């Protein structure tokens, strides 16, 4: 749908782009005609990533992109996301409660508490030397957990 919204109408072109993106997100091209409901959770996430990136946006919003996935699936998906972000030079706004995901995917971090921004800065600086009490609690609870 997204390619058609941008004016693509030729079936061969649409299918070709879809095949390219299935390959980029590591889904077997032979499954191009499968309904999304037939995919596993991790494959559905990768399919959604392809759907959102097919039009080459400059900015992407991700809300808990690895939520609900097994740890092994999360690792593969995070690796894929990291490579796509670098390859496409994407700006990403990422919402996550997982500090490992934040550390892996972000350059800058904003910590919110009760709807207010309490700390911002380079990811490593904020996580390695938190100044706000909530950020300190957040980081220490992850280290102890």
Each language-model region and where it sits:
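Conserved ABC ATPase "signature" region
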Residues: 13-30, 139-140
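C-terminal boundary and immediately downstream tail of ABC-type ATPase nucleotide-binding domains
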Residues: 26, 127-145
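Conserved ABC ATPase signature
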Residues: 35-39, 43
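Conserved catalytic motifs of ABC-family nucleotide-binding domains
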Residues: 56
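A short, surface-exposed alpha-helical micro-motif characterized by mixed small hydrophobic
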Residues: 102-104
């Amino acid at each position: 749908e997204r390619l058609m919204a941008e004016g693509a109408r030729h079936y061969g072109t649409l299918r070709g782009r879809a095949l390219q993106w299935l390959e980029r997100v590591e889904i077997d091209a032979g499954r191009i005609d499968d309904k999304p409901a037939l995919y596993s959770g991790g494959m559905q996430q990768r399919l959604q990533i392809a759907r959102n990136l097919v039009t080459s946006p400059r900015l992407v919003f991700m809300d808990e992109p690895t939520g609900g996935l097994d740890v092994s699936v999360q690792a593969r998906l995070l690796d894929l996301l990291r490579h796509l972000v670098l390859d496409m030079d994407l700006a990403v706004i990422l919402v996550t409660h997982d500090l490992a995901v934040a550390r892996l995917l972000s350059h800058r971090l904003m910590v919110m508490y009760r709807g207010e921004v309490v700390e911002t800065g380079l990811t490593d600086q904020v996580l390695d030397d938190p100044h706000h009490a909530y950020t300190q609690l957040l980081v220490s609870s992850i280290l102890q957990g």
